[in-house]
Each structure stands twice: as C-alpha cells, then as structure tokens.
C-alpha cells in the first residue's frame, strides 16, 4: 500500500536515514512548511520519488523558482486534501 510522507521540517541526518530506509517505490512525498528546505539539501529525493510541495510554503520560503525547475509538482491546499483522501496511509516527519 503506497504511503504519503508529510515532511514539515528540515530532516536531520538520522531522520533522513530513517525515511530512506522505509520509502517504497510507489510512496509519495509532500513537502510543507520548513520541510520545503529539504528540496535543496536532500534533492536526491526529488529524482527518485513522486513529490509535491505546497505553493504557499514555497512562496513563503522563497523556493518557488527553484522548485519549478525540478520534477516536483506544486500544489495548493485543495490538492493537498485530495492527496490525503487518495492515500489511506500517511506518515508525518517533523
């Protein structure tokens, strides 16, 4: 069963390793709040997994233009809700 991983803070090395250990190929990442900073520092995630980021957080942290150049999908709050409905299982990383 695919999992939606909600990443809302900057992952330290230990949390990052835990995440990498449990991620499956069909899992999805959603970056929110300060978690959007991981998109720069942990950009290997962007190439290996389907990922999403909230546009309001990207704008707030000045990362919108950076993320537009990646394969990450930029979404709004209604789309965030739809992701939560679609994925029966979610894990929050913070």
Label every model-predicted segment.
Residues 3-15, 28:
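Short, glycine-rich nucleotide/cofactor-binding loops
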Residues 14, 37-40, 76-79:
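A short, acidic, amphipathic alpha-helical segment used as a generic capping/interface helix at domain edges
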Residues 18-19:
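Short acidic/Ser/Thr-enriched loop-to-helix initiation segments
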Residues 24:
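Short conserved AdoMet
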Residues 36-47, 63:
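N-terminal beta-loop-helix "entrance" segment that forms/cooperates
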Residues 65-94:
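C-terminal structural segments of small proteins and small subunits
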């Amino acid at each position: 069963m695919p999992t939606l991983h909600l990443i809302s803070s900057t992952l330290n090395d230990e949390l990052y390793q835990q995440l990498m250990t449990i991620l499956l190929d069909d899992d999805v990442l959603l970056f929110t709040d300060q978690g959007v900073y991981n998109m720069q520092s942990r950009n290997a995630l962007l190439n290996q997994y389907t990922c999403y980021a909230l546009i309001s957080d990207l704008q707030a942290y000045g990362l919108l233009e950076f993320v537009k150049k990646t394969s990450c999908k930029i979404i709004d709050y209604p789309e965030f809700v739809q992701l939560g409905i679609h994925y029966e299982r979610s894990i929050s990383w913070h």
